[in-house]
Regions:
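Hydrophobic alpha-helical bundle architecture
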Residues: 152-167, 172, 176-191
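Glycine-rich, mobile lid/loop segments that gate access to catalytic sites or pores
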Residues: 37-83, 89-94
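Phosphate/pyrophosphate-binding betaalpha-module
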Residues: 86-143, 149
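Conserved small/polar residues in nucleotide/adenosyl-binding loops
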Residues: 213-219
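Short glycine/serine/threonine-rich phosphate/pyrophosphate-binding segments
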Residues: 76, 81-88, 147-150, 171-175
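Non-transmembrane, aqueous-exposed alpha-helical and coiled segments at domain scale
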Residues: 195-205
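Active-site cofactor/substrate anionic-group-binding motifs, chiefly glycine-
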Residues: 1-22
Length: 219
């Protein structure tokens, strides 16, 4: 009964929910749970490098399974809370841009909330010192399992020759990680729209990808 479920049904498309790291056990059809949530990145790394790699591998495995079933195009999406924070952190490090210029209001933060968000990202980056030349290190230290899984899907697209469509900001950050790991992945990544998050335009420009709509879903 979710909006995405209804849209998929109307368009005769299938949806595959995946549990990458929910804090509780779920009944989703595909369980790739790597941890019961990530850690507080303002106090230490969000996850271990091993967990980040497992997340990437889970995404690649999903593409392999769907490729074996005959799917010829895939799209990514996520349901997360607070994941524009991790995405802005990852984008800021990988693009070597100031946190203030890469961070937006997400689902509708107040001005005070935005300041707290920016400060939290700055603290996490200063504490963990992610290496901008090592996308997996950045993912592990200030990213999330949702981002890892989707980055793996984009990598899987390159491995199996299947185009993968980016959704919003979090999905774009995942695609950026995939491209930093494997530049050839770019040839299999398609943009659907550009998010209103400040970093979105810079990410698409960096990837050399063109979007066709400005969705602005929260307005």
């Amino acid at each position: 009964d979710t909006s995405v479920g209804v849209m998929c049904k109307q368009n005769h498309a299938e949806i595959f929910p995946v549990d990458m790291g929910m804090v509780t056990d779920t009944k989703v059809r595909t369980d790739h749970k790597i941890a019961y949530g990530t850690q507080n990145m303002t106090k230490g790394p969000a996850m271990t490098r091993e967990q980040a790699v497992k997340g990437l591998e889970a995404g690649i495995d999903m593409v392999r399974e769907l490729n074996d079933k005959g799917y010829r195009i895939l799209a990514t999406g996520e349901m997360g809370i607070g994941n524009t924070t991790t995405s802005s952190a990852v984008a800021s490090v990988l693009l070597k841009q100031p946190v203030e210029e890469m961070t937006g209001r997400g689902a509708g933060l107040t001005s005070e909330g935005l300041v707290r968000k920016i400060n939290a990202i700055k603290k996490a980056i200063a504490l963990n010192e992610p290496d901008p030349e090592d996308a997996i290190d950045v993912l592990a230290k200030v990213g999330g399992l949702d981002i890892a899984g989707m980055a793996g899907v984009f990598l899987g697209g390159a491995v199996y020759g299947i185009p993968v469509v980016m959704d919003g900001f979090i999905s774009c950050v995942s695609a950026l990680i995939a491209m930093r790991i494997c530049p050839a992945a770019r040839d299999y990544i398609l943009a659907s729209h550009v998010s209103k998050e400040p970093a979105a335009h810079l990410i698409l420009e960096n990837m050399g990808t063109v979007s066709y709509t400005h969705l602005r879903a929260h307005e």
